[in-house]
Each structure stands twice: as structure tokens, then as C-alpha cells.
């Protein structure tokens, strides 16, 4: 191992000088004698490399000895990581002792080649009505949960992990990228209480950590997911929040002295996003289905960060503040959310017709709202009155009590099969439940519960 010394420290960016014949490669991990790990980002010439610190640079000083490990950052992978919380370097931070690692993989890997990739159109049932109906997930697809602050991205994600672990008994990897430590803690205890902790690996790089950690923690989680996939499993990979990954890239880019591009983002925004997203894919051995929470700055979907993310996704689940303000949770906007799987050749004609019928009625209701606001319901034709009545039932029937939100709602969570979901909405569209009051449709699971609830009203 060749040794160098620190020559300059600017916040999280550290310049290290090595002998001319032993300059580290880009992405090599370096170890400072204080125990801090650095990752080489640029070679400046004259034996000097510019690195990003994967940890706080407090207490560092010029002249400290730095050793080159001659390898990129390597993290433990395999079943020993399940039920554990790790940091960006794969070190345990849950005070449960060392991780008995089976093997270590480098976090920088190339994406699978074209011939290794598989294209599956198999659906992944989530048990959440609005998602299964309007924006179904593909096994091995990429899903984005879009929403501003406080509309329920993390709760939706927790419900998905719980449903996949319990109903499909699959493994999940959760990468907490630049989110609140409190959320990470809640998440851990929620998984523990739901008895699914032994099926989830948790990798955290929280808000208060340096930008290097937040930039690399998604790759650490992805590497663990790739290991499960290459063992022939169908694995779920959750990222909360992909926007913070971009933001960390912006911070690092500015510190490295690159010129900013639109809205101050890094010039390499599309490439950095591609490096992560291209590795999240299904091969002939197994699949990675990824669910990514995407914070939308100022609710503006045209911001370069969410806009770049859109290009990679198969399904987009858009959470809306208007729907949340009506008290309808999950606050998924059925008119804004899309899925490439919603195609009669993939989901079947019946599912497609019901989903489009639901969207059609909700769209018509949206148009009629202005007329109702000005002239009142009485001015509508009988046909339009029926549309409004059915739309309001559909709106309420799209809500659902979550298992992970039982504390807030006070009602037990419900998992609804796709068959029951289609049956329920088809019945509403065909007018079978026109006689039932709309309150009966609010916060229930299947249509049978609606009928049960209506009897007691």
C-alpha cells in the first residue's frame, strides 16, 4: 500500500499528495491515519489527487498520512446484511455487533450487458387499490413516488415493504439517502414491529452526514440488492429519497470546482442519475424492482432533478396535496399517475377498461366542479348528477387503511387483491352500488366491506 499526505482541506474535499509513481486511480478508497475513508474523484497532476471525505473532516490537518487501499469502497453483501443497519461503508451502526460477512463487493460496478437483461411484463401485486388499478408495478420495473413535503411518500414506501415482505416473502434493501434520522429510526422500529426486519437490509446516509456519504449510500444499497438478484431472487430496492442523491451530487460538484448548469445543478446530473438507474435492472437470473421516493422541490415537476428521474421510470405514482387535504390517503392522484404496464396486452382487457373508466369519470367530475361551484348541483343534467355521485364514490373508494398507519387512522390495515380491486371499481362504474351512501366507501378495503359498512349506517 502506497502512502501519501494531506496537502489541502476544503470542507468535505481533501487533496492528497502521493509519489509520482504511485498515484491512486479514480474511485480508489484511501484511509487516513485518523480512520476516515476518502474516495478519489480527480487526479490534479503532480501526484496530487482530489478526494471526497466519506465522514466528517473535523480534526483533520495537513501532513496527516494517507494510505491507498488500491481498491474501490467494498461493502459486505449477502444474507448476513438482513436485519442490520449499515452506513455507506457497510459498517454496522445498530450496535448489534459485527456483520459476519460472506463476501465483499465494490460499490462501483458496471450495469448488466444487453444480452444479460430480461424484459418481463409480470405484474407485482402491491395490495394497494389505487396503485394496482391505475399504475400497476412491473416485476423488475422502476417506480417513482413523486410528491412535495408531507404528502406521504415515506408511509407509502413502508406499506409497500410490509406488503411485499408478508404477502410475497421477498427480500428488500432500503437505502435512506439524506433523509431525517428520526424517519430512519421510526422505519427500523416499524419493520421490527411488523416482523419483517429479517427480510430487509437497511443502509443509511442521513441528512446531517457529509455530501460524500449521501452521494454514495445509494450505490452501497444497490450493490447489496445486486447480490441478492445474482443469487436468483426477486428483490425490492427502496430509495428514500432520490432527490437528496442529486442534491449531494450538486454539493460535491460545487466543491470539486465544476461549473454549475441549469438551476445550479451539477453539469453531470443526467450521467450520475444514469449510473445509478442503469444498474437497477432485471437479468435472466433475478430481478430488482425499485421504488424511489422523489421529493419535488416547490411542487414543480419540471425542475431538472425530478425531470431527469422521470426518464428512467416505468410507473409514476404522483401524490397530490389537494387529495391529501380532502383526507383521502394514500393521496395518489389517479389522473396524474401513469404506468407503462397499463396496456390491455399486459394487464388484460377488463383491468384496462375499468382503469380507463375510473379515470374518465374522475376527469369528467373535475370538469364539472367549476359549474357546481358557480351554479350548484341542481343545474346539472341527470346524467351529470350520476357521474358526480359515482365519481365521489370512486374518490373515496380509492382510499385505504394502511397497516403501517394504524396508529394514525385507528382502523386495521387492509391488503386488497387485484381481483377484488377490479371487481369493486367495475361495480361502481356499472351502477351496482348507486343506492349506497358515499361515506360507506371511505377508508375500507374491498367492496364487501363497503356493503357491510352500509348496513350499519
From Swiss-Prot:
Protein name in the entry: ATP synthase subunit beta
Reactions performed catalytically: ATP + H2O + 4 H(+)(in) = ADP + phosphate + 5 H(+)(out)
Binding site for ATP: 147-154
UniProt entry keywords in alphabetical sequence: ATP synthesis, ATP-binding, Cell inner membrane, Cell membrane, CF(1), Hydrogen ion transport, Ion transport, Membrane, Nucleotide-binding, Translocase, Transport
Cited function: Produces ATP from ADP in the presence of a proton gradient across the membrane. The catalytic sites are hosted primarily by the beta subunits.
Record bears the keyword Electron transport: no
Gene name for this UniProt entry: atpD
Domain of life: Bacteria
HAMAP family on file: ATP_synth_beta_bact
GO cellular component: a single term: proton-transporting ATP synthase complex
Membrane topology: Peripheral membrane protein
Xref: Gene3D superfamilies: 2.40.10.170, Bovine Mitochondrial F1-atpase, Atp Synthase Beta Chain, Chain D, domain 3, P-loop containing nucleotide triphosphate hydrolases
Subunit structure: F-type ATPases have 2 components, CF(1) - the catalytic core - and CF(0) - the membrane proton channel. CF(1) has five subunits: alpha(3), beta(3), gamma(1), delta(1), epsilon(1). CF(0) has three main subunits: a(1), b(2) and c(9-12). The alpha and beta chains form an alternating ring which encloses part of the gamma chain. CF(1) is attached to CF(0) by a central stalk formed by the gamma and epsilon chains, while a peripheral stalk is formed by the delta and b chains.
Assigned protein family: Belongs to the ATPase alpha/beta chains family.
